Amino acid sequence: MMENNRNYFIAIALSVLIVLGWQFLYMNPRIEAQRKAQEAQKAQQQTEQVQQPAAGGQTPAQTSGAAPSGQAAATATLEQALQKSPRVVIDTPALSGSINLAGARLDDLKLKGYHETVDDSSPIITLFSPAETKDGYFTELGYIGSDATGSVPGPSTLWTAPEGAKLTEKTPVTLSYTNDKGLTFTRTISVDERYMFTVADKIENTGQAPAALSSYGRVTRYNKPTTPSVYVLHEGFIGVIGDDGLIETKYSAVEKEAVAPAKSTGGWLGITDKYWAATIVPPQSAAYEAHFSYFADGQPRYQADYKDDAFTVAPGQSIELKNLVFAGAKEVPVIDGYEASYSIPKFDRLIDWGWFYFITKPMFKLMDFFFRYFGNFGVAILCTTIVVKALFFPLASKQYASMANMKRMQPKMEELKAKFADDRMGLQQATMQLYKEEKINPIAGCWPVALQIPIFFSLYKVIYITIEMRHAPFFGWIKDLSAPDPTTIVNLFGLLPFEGPTLLHLGVWPLIMGVTMFVQMRMNPTPPDPTQAMIFNWMPLVFMFMLASFPAGLVIYWAWNNTLSVAQQGLIMKRHGVKVELFDNLKGLFRRKEAPSK
């Protein structure tokens, strides 16, 4: 029974950690995000009352020390902003929008394959919008020069494009700009069928003097996302920059202090959301300085940018540069494909696989394999769980073999307790000697529990972060595996015309999970200690309410895992000659307790 008690204490400790972790990592950030969103909205309303919208974009001050930071955004509707300057239409299988010829900005982009809700008639996702709108978000590539070089392409430079130009996956567009010093900039923009833009620039010097230039690239965003952030997921600045490797910086950290990694060669940088991202891959052979910055003038503005070392274009010569711009959904095979085909270092880390990367990503690959076969990610979760249980079967077998041996040792353990009733140290020494003689490892039963913790959190990451799970249906009422079960027992699962308090929302799948957890715990004898027994009885109920707000896919996994565990434990216990006490324990719940003898 000591082994069982030890396992109970471990389970209790883990349960407490999970509950506290859930509160700290999930609920607290949601509450804080809602509070900040309300404060930001109030501050914005106050700002709009005293600040008149700027009339058009103004060229920011440009220095040789950093990329342009943009300007405080005006507040205009999308339609008004799109009419302020000429544009080139973007139309591909995955994207729609336009390129702003003022600055050659990519600032109008929608993702055709994704809707805001599970309803296909809902609006498609807007990734980029012009700086003049409330939540402006764009990428821009330009140059920094000196008075001697004349005007060079920057935020307000008006490029020219052929009449009727249209960017598709098959037809690139070519933009051009010539200044009064004889510098001609020719920019060819192409895009593939998904989300990667290639921007190839050619600079020709037809003037009389050498031209010293630096190129820059930036991803600029006005205001933070309004979706609640959680600590298990990184949203904000991201990049793989030279020897510094992967850098993930929260918005809040940059608000306190700008981040400027060491000068580097190679890599990429940008801004990432849960499902979407915008990144720039600079020319990989040139040294550059990267910056993650925050600007508080006007609307809050966040910027990831780079500026490369100065280079010189001699008279009569030309130079060519190429940048890559990723703007779209973080689809796993697409991201992996870009990493391989463009040799972008660690580009797959754009998806937040977490600390258990070596488990999380292979688990997604396995799940994706089953999805391709069955066409349903819910079924893929069930199949993946079976594979994981099969892999852990030898460990589980050892665990229950250890439990069987411990149960066989109970009579001897009781004798030792009676013999050393007043000698705690002597009991411990005698117990350890008994373990040694019988070749029993008292902690053998703990390893399967400990080893499955990374598996659980890795699966949670897969379900929570991968866009493939977004709006992925199961069967029946589950239309989105990445969202909580929408049903609730409060209104009898939709039969009554009200919702009830959110705290009491308890869907069908959390109920199923609670029942399976209850049955699994009844496979073992109830602890003799009253406190342990009380926790033993209440744990399924606590977990039901705790998991009610978790993604439905995770709850389905847990319920299915419990079911498989019951079957697995019963099989192993029979193989080792241990009585399965499930039905006896269930019957014991309904037996009337005998009155104590007087």
UniProtKB/Swiss-Prot annotation:
This is Membrane protein insertase YidC. GO terms for cellular component: plasma membrane. It is a multi-pass membrane protein. The gene is yidC. Keywords: Cell inner membrane, Cell membrane, Chaperone, Membrane, Protein transport, Transmembrane, Transmembrane helix, Transport. It is found in: Cell inner membrane. It comes from the Bacteria. It comes from Rhizobium johnstonii (strain DSM 114642 / LMG 32736 / 3841). Required for the insertion and/or proper folding and/or complex formation of integral membrane proteins into the membrane. Involved in integration of membrane proteins that insert both dependently and independently of the Sec translocase complex, as well as at least some lipoproteins. Aids folding of multispanning membrane proteins. The chain crosses the membrane at residues 7-27, 377-397, 447-467, 492-512, 538-558. GO terms for molecular function: membrane insertase activity. CDD domains: 5TM_YidC_Alb3 (cd20070), EcYidC-like_peri (cd19961). Pfam families: 60KD_IMP, YidC_periplas. Belongs to the OXA1/ALB3/YidC family. Type 1 subfamily. Residues 37-76 are annotated as: Disordered. Residues 40-76 have a biased composition (Low complexity).
